[in-house]
């Protein structure tokens, strides 16, 4: 009882103390308004609350420019005027309801925005609910929403000063600094912009930087009001490929208090009513979102341009012909691929069934495949493949290059595969494509890759299980090469150094070679060493030994014992000179590519037992590995690797790969694998113990996807037919388009304007091949030309009240041709030949268009061009020796 009285007394004391009037405030009001000021005040009752109305003056300025040198000359958009902020309600949970209203416009471009209501959390200014007046039909971004977004933070209440959260711009880092000298600071940066399409195949080809810096000045004497706000906002799209590419946007906002009024009114809602609910009940406000402003219109409505762009591409193709490509091929395809995502089924039906589009159906099929939705698969099967089944390959290539990671799309692909006969060619083509699609699903993030490798991805497990259920086939392993995860690796490893056929073991080695070195373990390395040493139960072909070398060298230096096991096998009388020559060249190539590996092998050779000897220079062999850097600029390294095997002076197989590396991430751009069997009996005139029917096959890989193997000839009859048909005519070996950039986003600015940005990019490639064999002159000439076009295109449009203000376009394109020319003389056996590899001039064009959409509509166009001279690439020592021999024969 006594304690209860003490607590009651303390409560009364606190209440009395808190009720003591502010004498300084009373004296101030008496001096200002006279002695009758308090007599004339309305009588307050228990339903009367004290609220605030604060008047502010504001000014915002926005500008977009293509180059910093033009910043001072370019126009800007200014909005200035006055607005008021009113407090309307406080709830018991610490929430507060405020209203922002335009009171005056000084620049005649403010429009007529309706008041905005915001429910926020006191203490941290955390925005929770945004509401609009009921008489406003559509909520469209304007400067009132911008002011609200400037003052209130998207950070979560109570989660600290530094957070990475979802904002209206995307997922961003938000820092709300503690007060220093009456000033707070909010920084928003490191944003993953946009909630729509934001795809980049090669990280770093286009950099996007968004920064927001807001300073708040507080009045610490009277209720801690914000008396001044200064905000700076910057958005820049740039590319390391060209310093003039892109644009920069800046906006600045200044807000300053002009008046502060206390008002006493009857409370609008009971304090138990949440602030957002009070806005709806008392003011009829309608919610338009939370801190993400979900139902506020930001992006401008645009009609779909798919049909128009396809028509433009068709006319361009008619004017230019089909012999080569230009920068417009890749540019137009990238735009078509972007519009394809928003196209409806009737748009596709119209494009596919339009008679004049027959010669561009390959492009339409590729774009449809790249959409990556369940609806696109249905449209492709029911419309495209029903009317034009010959375009299955183009459709599948488009699917393989899609950036989509849609679960329903993956299931539709699996349903399609399940409906096909496993004995049909279509089944294996579709399976080969699905393997690449699911591999992208696994590589989407570190966690998803771990999930795939641990067998936790149901759809991936089902695909591999169904594919391998019918037993082992070479085609099964070729498909698994496109999805080299742990399940594929484990399946392939079972056939290494076992009793399976040579073709199966070779295909299994290719799967393991494609897999990550993180999957390799001691059991595998021991099997590979046995292959290399030719100590398996079956005799090991040289091809298998060389593939084993390629895999073992990937292990180094992670598995350091591998180097010891290899070098211990060295002798002065090697069993297979081609194998050992290939090993030494492969070690040299790996050292050229990676300095750490070069240092590792150098240290190994310093041991007395492993010191190099005359054997390295005395080998009479032509098999080799050649690594060559092509370009290194802007942190991108472009290089090629060529692996070639010879058997008894005759060509056996080769793998050429063109790759790009940025940081630790390596991308395969193009690969060409040529494989032959049993040709030595025709080339050298001698039959080996492995003699059989001659075979030749080719497999092309583009942007991480290996196409199905194409068999050139099987048997002597096919070989002879191929030779007779080699009359020098040019054939199209491959044509395809690879999207590399697809971004579409709308950015609401703190100045009240909005910015729509579209960024697209693609690489187009056309490979033409020709071969001529003259049995009379005993000469042959084979030529392959890869015409390559790449484009990156960016458009940025600044809008004010949905009206265009300024438009910037920036484009960069590159065009070049890669050529290989092989000539041979077969007057004597073994024949002599020479290979020449070259690259034509690299033409780089950059174009910028800046156009004002108001006033005189001034337009500025800038064209810039650079030409990098073509080069003929240095050959490996073995190839140089062969070329010298060829030239000697040619002179004779």
UniProtKB/Swiss-Prot annotation:
GO cellular component terms, A-Z: basolateral plasma membrane; endoplasmic reticulum; Golgi apparatus
Annotated coiled-coil segments of the chain: none
Record's signal peptide: 1-19
GO terms for MF: lipid binding; lipid transfer activity; phospholipid transporter activity
Effect of residue 146 to T: In qm182; lipid contents in the intestine increases by 40%, and by 80% on a klf-3 mutant background
Effect of inactivating the gene: RNAi-mediated knockdown suppresses the slow germline development and the delayed egg-production of clk-1 mutants, but does not affect the rate of postembryonic development.
Keywords: Endoplasmic reticulum, Lipid transport, Lipid-binding, Signal, Transport
Gene Ontology terms: biological process: endoplasmic reticulum unfolded protein response; IRE1-mediated unfolded protein response; lipoprotein metabolic process; lipoprotein transport; plasma lipoprotein particle assembly
Location of the protein in the cell: Endoplasmic reticulum
UniProt xrefs under InterPro entries: MTP_lip-bd, MTTP
Pfam families cross-referenced by the UniProt entry: MTP_lip_bd
Role: Catalyzes the transport of cholesteryl ester, and phospholipid between phospholipid surfaces. Does not catalyze transport of triglycerides. Required for the assembly and secretion of plasma lipoproteins that contain apolipoprotein B. Required for normal expression of klf-3.
Subunit structure as annotated in this protein's UniProt entry: Heterodimer; heterodimerizes with protein disulfide isomerase.
PANTHER family found in the cross-reference section: MICROSOMAL TRIACYLGLYCEROL TRANSFER PROTEIN, MICROSOMAL TRIGLYCERIDE TRANSFER PROTEIN, LARGE SUBUNIT
Name listed for the protein in its UniProt record: Microsomal triglyceride transfer protein homolog
Source species of the chain: Caenorhabditis elegans
Name of encoding gene: dsc-4
């Amino acid at each position: 009882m006594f304690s209860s009285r003490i607590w009651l007394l303390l409560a009364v004391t606190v209440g009395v103390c808190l009720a003591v009037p502010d004498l300084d405030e009373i004296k101030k009001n008496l001096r200002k308004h006279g002695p009758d000021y308090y007599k004339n005040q309305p009588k307050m009752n228990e339903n009367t609350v004290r609220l605030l109305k604060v008047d502010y003056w504001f000014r915002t300025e926005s500008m977009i420019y293509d180059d910093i040198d033009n910043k001072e000359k370019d126009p800007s958009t200014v909005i200035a005027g006055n607005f008021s902020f009113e407090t309307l309600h406080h709830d018991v949970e610490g929430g507060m309801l405020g209203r922002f209203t335009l009171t005056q416009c000084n620049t005649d471009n403010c429009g007529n925005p309706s008041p905005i209501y915001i429910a926020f959390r006191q203490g941290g200014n955390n925005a929770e609910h945004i509401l609009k007046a009921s008489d406003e039909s559509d909520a469209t971004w304007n400067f009132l929403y911008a002011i609200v977004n400037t003052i209130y933070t998207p950070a979560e209440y109570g989660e600290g000063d530094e957070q990475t959260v979802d904002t209206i711009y995307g997922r961003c880092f938000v820092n709300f600094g503690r007060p220093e000298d009456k000033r707070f600071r909010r920084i928003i940066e490191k944003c993953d912009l946009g909630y729509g399409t934001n795809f980049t195949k090669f990280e770093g080809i286009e950099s996007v930087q968004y920064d927001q810096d807001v300073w708040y000045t507080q009045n610490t004497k009277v209720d801690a009001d914000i008396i001044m706000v200064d905000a700076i906002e910057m958005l820049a799209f740039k590319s390391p490929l060209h310093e003039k590419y892109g644009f920069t946007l800046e906006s600045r906002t200044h807000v300053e208090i002009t008046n502060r009024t206390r008002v006493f009114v009857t409370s609008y809602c009971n304090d138990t009513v949440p602030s957002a609910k009070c806005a709806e009940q008392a003011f009829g406000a309608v919610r338009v979102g939370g801190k993400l402003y979900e139902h506020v219109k930001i992006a401008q409505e645009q009609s779909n341009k798919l049909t128009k762009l396809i028509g433009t591409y068709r006319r361009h193709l008619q004017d230019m012909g089909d012999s080569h490509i230009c920068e417009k091929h890749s540019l137009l395809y990238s735009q078509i691929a972007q519009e394809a995502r928003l196209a409806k089924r009737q748009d596709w039906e119209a494009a596919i069934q339009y008679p004049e589009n027959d010669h561009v159906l390959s492009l339409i099929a590729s774009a449809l495949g790249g959409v990556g939705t369940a609806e696109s698969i249905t449209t492709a099967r029911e419309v495209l493949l029903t009317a034009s089944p010959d375009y299955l390959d183009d459709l599948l290539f488009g699917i393989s290059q899609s950036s989509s990671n849609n679960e329903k799309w993956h299931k539709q692909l699996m349903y399609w595969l399940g409906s096909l006969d496993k004995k049909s060619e279509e089944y294996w083509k579709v399976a080969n494509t699905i393997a690449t699609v699911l591999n992208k699903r696994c590589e989407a993030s570190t966690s998803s890759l771990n999930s795939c490798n641990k067998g936790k991805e149901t759809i991936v497990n089902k695909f591999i299980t169904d594919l391998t259920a019918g037993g082992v086939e070479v085609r099964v392993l070729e498909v698994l090469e496109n999805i080299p995860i742990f399940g594929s690796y484990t399946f392939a490893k079972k056939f290494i150094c076992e009793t399976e056929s040579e073709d199966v073991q070779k295909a299994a080695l290719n799967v393991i070679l494609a897999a990550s070195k993180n999957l390799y373990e001691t059991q595998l390395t021991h099997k590979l060493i046995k292959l290399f040493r030719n100590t398996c139960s079956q005799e090991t072909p040289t091809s298998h030994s060389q593939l084993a070398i390629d895999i073992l060298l990937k292990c180094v230096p992670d598995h350091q014992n591998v180097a010891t096991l290899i070098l211990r096998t060295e002798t002065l009388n090697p069993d297979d000179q081609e194998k050992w020559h290939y090993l030494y060249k492969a070690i040299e190539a790996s050292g050229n590519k990676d300095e750490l590996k070069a240092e590792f092998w150098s240290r190994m050779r310093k041991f007395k037992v492993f010191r190099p000897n005359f054997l390295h220079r005395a080998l009479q062999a032509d098999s080799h590995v050649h690594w060559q850097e092509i370009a290194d600029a802007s942190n991108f390294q472009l290089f090629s690797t060529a692996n070639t095997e010879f058997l008894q002076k005759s060509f056996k197989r080769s793998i050429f790969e063109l790759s790009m590396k940025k940081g630790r991430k390596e991308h395969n751009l193009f690969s060409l694998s040529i494989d032959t069997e049993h040709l030595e009996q025709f080339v050298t005139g001698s039959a080996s113990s492995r003699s059989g029917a001659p075979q030749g096959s080719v497999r092309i890989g583009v942007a991480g996807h290996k196409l199905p193997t194409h068999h050139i000839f099987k048997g002597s009859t096919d070989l002879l037919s191929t030779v007779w048909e080699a009359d020098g005519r040019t054939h199209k070996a491959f044509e395809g388009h690879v999207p590399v950039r697809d971004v579409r986003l709308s950015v609401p600015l703190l100045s009240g304007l909005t910015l729509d940005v579209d960024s697209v990019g693609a690489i187009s490639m056309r490979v033409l091949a020709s071969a001529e064999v003259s049995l009379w002159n005993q000469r042959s000439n084979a030529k392959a030309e890869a015409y390559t076009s790449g484009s990156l295109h960016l458009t940025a449009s600044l809008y004010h009240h949905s009206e265009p203000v300024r438009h910037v376009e920036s484009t960069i394109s590159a065009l070049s041709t890669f050529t290989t020319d092989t000539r041979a003389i077969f007057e004597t056996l073994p024949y002599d030949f020479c290979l020449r590899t070259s690259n034509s001039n690299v033409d780089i064009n950059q174009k910028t268009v800046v156009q004002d959409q108001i006033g005189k509509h001034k337009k500025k166009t800038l064209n810039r061009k650079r030409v990098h001279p073509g080069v003929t690439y240095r050959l490996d020592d073995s190839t140089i020796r062969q070329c010298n021999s060829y030239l000697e024969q040619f002179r004779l």
